[in-house]
Amino acid sequence: MKDLVKFLKAQSKTSEDFDVIKIGLASPDMIRSWSFGEVKKPETINYRTFKPERDGLFCARIFGPVKDYECLCGKYKRLKHRGVICEKCGVEVTQTKVRRERMGHIELASPVAHIWFLKSLPSRIGLLLDMPLRDIERVLYFEMYIVTEPGMTDLERGQLLTEEQYLDAEDRWQDEFEAKMGAEAIQDLLKGMDLEAECEKLREELQETNSETKRKKITKRLKLLEAFVQSGNKPEWMVMTVLPVLPPDLRPLVPLDGGRFATSDLNDLYRRVINRNNRLKRLLDLIAPDIIVRNEKRMLQESVDALLDNGRRGRAITGSNRRPLKSLADMIKGKQGRFRQNLLGKRVDYSGRSVITVGPYLHLHQCGLPKKMALELFRPFIYAKLESRGYATTIKAAKKMVEREDAIVWDILAEVIREHPILLNRAPTLHRLGIQAFEPILIEGKAIQLHPLVCAAFNADFDGDQMAVHVPLTLEAQLEARALMMSTNNVLSPANGDPIIVPSQDVVLGLYYMTREKVNGKGEGMLLQDPREAEKAYRTGEAELHSRVKVRITEYVKNEAGEFDAKTTLTDTTIGRAILWMIAPKGMPYSLFNQTLGKKAISKLINEAYRRLGLKEAVMFADQIMYTGFAYAARSGSSVGIDDMEIPAKKYEIISAAEEEVAEIQEQFQSGLVTAGERYNKVIDIWAAANERVAKAMMENLSQEEVINREGNPEKQASFNSIFMMADSGARGSAAQIRQLAGMRGLMARPDGSIIETPITANFREGLNVLQYFISTHGARKGLADTALKTANSGYLTRRLVDVAQDLVIVEDDCGTHEGLVMTPLIEGGDEKVPLRELVLGRVAAEDILKPGTEEVLIPRNTLLDEKLCDVLDANSVDSVKVRSVVTCDTDFGVCAKCYGRDLARGHLINQGEAVGVIAAQSIGEPGTQLTMRTFHIGGAASAAAKESSVQVKNTGTVHLMNAKFVTNDESKLVLTSRNTELTITDAFGRTKEHYKVPYGAVLSKGDGQEVTAGETIANWDPHTMPVVSEVSGFVKFVDIIDGLTVTRQTDELTGLSSIVVQDVGERATAGKDLRPTIKLVDANGNDIFLPETDVLAQYFLPGKAIVSLDDGTAVKVGEPLARIPQESVGTKDITGGLPRVADLFEARKPKEPAILAEISGIVSFGKETKGKRRLLITPAEGETYEEMIPKWRQLNVFEGEMVQRGDVISDGAETPHDILRLRGVRAVTEYIVNEVQDVYRLQGVKINDKHIEVIVRQMLRKAVITKAYDSEFLEGEQVEVARVKIVNRQREAEGKPPVEFERELLGITKASLATESFISAASFQETTRVLTEAAVAGKRDELRGLKENVIVGRLIPAGTGFAYHQNRHKHRLVDDVVAKLSEEDEAAIADEFVITADDATQNLATLLNSEIED
């Protein structure tokens, strides 16, 4: 019993028992304390005896015996001698495995600088000594002397001397001073540093300096020095005097046949170090000439550098085959390094893989497992059963039986497998649905059978895909597999909450076919008493599947008590729909079935079943749908023949008409009326339009057929053409593909993306000629190349996303914040793109939601908005809701359940411990391969569409103008004088229906608050020029408008009108450089006019290229244009689309020419211009004027005297998220990133919930920059985790001190991953060397909070089921302390009292511990 208690004590001290991992610099003493002896010789093993040489790199005396419990000379063998040290060979008798953990060391004859701290930028040694890296290297590699002790001379400490200077100084001062070279000199300098004093000095300098660069430099150095002071690392440890030697079994030497050896590169590197070190020792003993010693020291330094990080400095040392040797640093970094290959990417035992095939008869929770495979995978279980049943006496006998495949073995296998779930995985596992659990059904054959409905989740098809099988061994693993990973528990997609168990292809076609209706089918108009009779009529051939009939349908509706009430009605339907109703579960409405079912409708069916009836019913229903779909797809006999591709008769006339138009344009081009570019664009437009018309004619032709109904009249019905049915049902193919089969192929692109102007007029049914085929090949090949690139890029994006979000877990229920995001429906132009309910469904309300126009609370705050509550919102026409969001969540490390809302894959509020970060990363990364890689070129049709010039309303309602300023002209229309004006149309309930952006100078026929009717045009503007609108009436007075100097006159040849064009500053003669052409408005007497209600003069500066068509002294009225500024035609600007755009957003990259935003609110004016820039001034109501230089070529959005708000756009361009964050705050930047990312995904038709993108944004925002530190631990300008600052501020508040002030900072995902608190996670991501160097110098602690760190140290992750485990661990920590306090006597007493088995002991211990906890 005593042993047992000891054993239990020892057990509790396992790997579980730490919470923090600290990294630091190793001191020489520490390295010696690890070591078991000094390696003195470079020899490895004796080539004859294969025994390790004494004192060599594989020495048994230092590292341990080569054979288990046997010393080298063979004097002591076997277990009884364990722990004895042989007096002959000095080897300890113990297990061989100590050779994996015992280290040795090498005493270096001269100190050597550690290359990581020297060369990894920024150089730590350089920063500490405040010397440039070049100088340090000169000293280290023996090119220059450095003064280490100036004494009474006028040399400085740390001054560099060349050989001559050194000799001169020696002549002058003899031994008053000390100067050295090599690592010793650096070591002396580092030893001599007084860190505390240096810190003080730097702090004072920081107070005094004003220059930003100096400040940054000092802060950097100060941070490093403070890190040294706090971590207890000593600077001189960055120079090594002792080198540790890795245990020999970690750098093995293996004899190959033929007397050669295979060895790890490290042995070569170590050998090199030892050789040079020994030679240096000898030279020092011989007191050799300085120059030789120096050379040897330099070589030693180089060989140690190569051992630690080969190739970082100079040429990499290569082995016999010219490839660089793999150094210690290479062992841990990169995809093949320790972190990613062995710690994060372990391989799994008990697994097999095979090809997959269809199992259409399986249930959703089953899969077919080949018997051969099952026998192999469940081997240990079978052995155990055979023994316990007494069929086999030993394991060996059991093994024989299994190998013979006795009959009894198969019976036992069936027993073992029963209710033992197995995991199936299909690579690439892009989201968590790529691994699911199933119950195996034993089958003959060698292929795994997979249920067709889970194919969508695995993205599997049966064209030769393979899948891997894994067996969960422990009870806990089986439990998890069954309760969490079973395919029946994964009906909804975690990305968007829609069902992912959706039928596709055959099943969809079958259901579509059986729910279609046909005019005048056999048996039309029958009256049937129930669906069973309908089926009978169909089976006996009395009625067709599609005939319209009346059937009595019984629906079941839930009442208040939750029981079903039957409700029977006579319904107009078809035979097929009535038959389908037979598989519908109770509680579903018949209306969902009484329609032609396409893929979307079927998806809705399953969704409704899940929401109304719960998981079990929905799963059974999905299975039934599948069986029925397959059956009726077979019955339909759909097939594709060449005659199904009907070419429309109109095609040829459409094409010839287009050809005529093209010829006409060609003539115009040749007579010089249109430019080459215009011709090209017009030709492409013509062909694109022709293609559309052919496609339309073809679809009309295909999609309908005319039939005679019962009354004998012709009636149109949807066609039963096989190709059309496949596309219409959503089973396979699309209108675009049918267009290529039966319409025309249309325009093709060249490899560079530009469009070839001669289209392919043929389709695939007619066949392509040689030229057409050749043009097609471009696109096809580009598609293949794109796909290959896309996969790699998409995978890398996913990896970065996972890495940045991996430590985000739900850690508490409610953080109590009132913050949130205000959601409004997304409306672009006249249509609602995303309705409000889609945005708020599954979120938690942050504030009470009131009934519009009243104070009545519809939904109290902190309520999860589910489908029913969203219906309430719709019914009350609520148009904006403030919901909780992860971005505004107040939890320190992690997020709270209320801020996250619904778990999309389960449909209820999310559980604690759910790893929402990883789910978000997978949801965004998984569809990555569906996004395009291209950047789109706007050419032809697209560029024409981009120029809108009016707003035509689609809904009747009320006009609202946002940030609008306008003047009323004499036709009493409004002329806008403000930029970025937004115009919205709201309905009677105040819901926004349409949303437009209206430019400056647009003429509006309706004002704010006025009613409009649908179809009315309420705004017009010229898309090609931007007017300068007069805001007062008066007479024009030209200032600085001098012909030939600042302006030129141009006369139009056709009209004879003359106009004045302002010259660009760059084109003017020197005399006109400083003149600023201006139109001033004066009254009849020539006095200045001020703008109404201001003291700003009515004068308008004209930029270059402005066109003035008025003359000096002309009278103008309010709202008339004074001048026109031509808008540069956008030409073909590429839009970055698809995957690269998403990556740019998440990396928070700054665009090439970012928009310029107003830094403060105030009045705009312009100061003196320089050659290429203008000076923009913003004067606020109070405070300093802000000025900024803006290049001339930037088009400005503001005029002199205009009022701007902070964050308004001053000059066009792509907005930078960093600016949005700085000027408009966290919510604005979240909204921006979410919307931009969603735009890309929406374009591809991929649905992702906003939550996931917000999760990533939260991680991008987790750092802050300290702006005011007061007396806290932070430095100003330092980058720290927001959570850290929050914690410190809470303490300061409690102590009554002012809180530390900070600004949030937006980091791209790669930067954010590398800047995480956990150095283990960062090191395993990228730039391993840099991360580890930084962490070691700072003496960082890793709290093991994230998932990745815990996987690396080999524990359960603190998420999911591991979340509870880690919480319990912390509880048990307290208990273990209690057990540890038991004294020896108590233990003895316990031992006397009980004589019990180990199992009982564990049980007793458990009760003991529980009682302790309760106490």
Swiss-Prot record:
Stated name of the protein: DNA-directed RNA polymerase subunit beta'
Residues that bind Mg(2+): 461, 463, 465
NCBIfam families with a match to the protein in the record: rpoC_TIGR (TIGR02386)
Swiss-Prot/TrEMBL catalytic activity: RNA(n) + a ribonucleoside 5'-triphosphate = RNA(n+1) + diphosphate
Cofactor (UniProt): Mg(2+); Zn(2+)
Pfam family, one: RNA_pol_Rpb1_3
Coiled coil region boundaries: none
Keyword Chaperone: no
Keywords for this protein: DNA-directed RNA polymerase, Magnesium, Metal-binding, Nucleotidyltransferase, Transcription, Transferase, Zinc
Family designation: Belongs to the RNA polymerase beta' chain family.
Originating species: Haemophilus influenzae (strain ATCC 51907 / DSM 11121 / KW20 / Rd)
Molecular function GO labels: DNA binding; DNA-directed RNA polymerase activity; magnesium ion binding; zinc ion binding
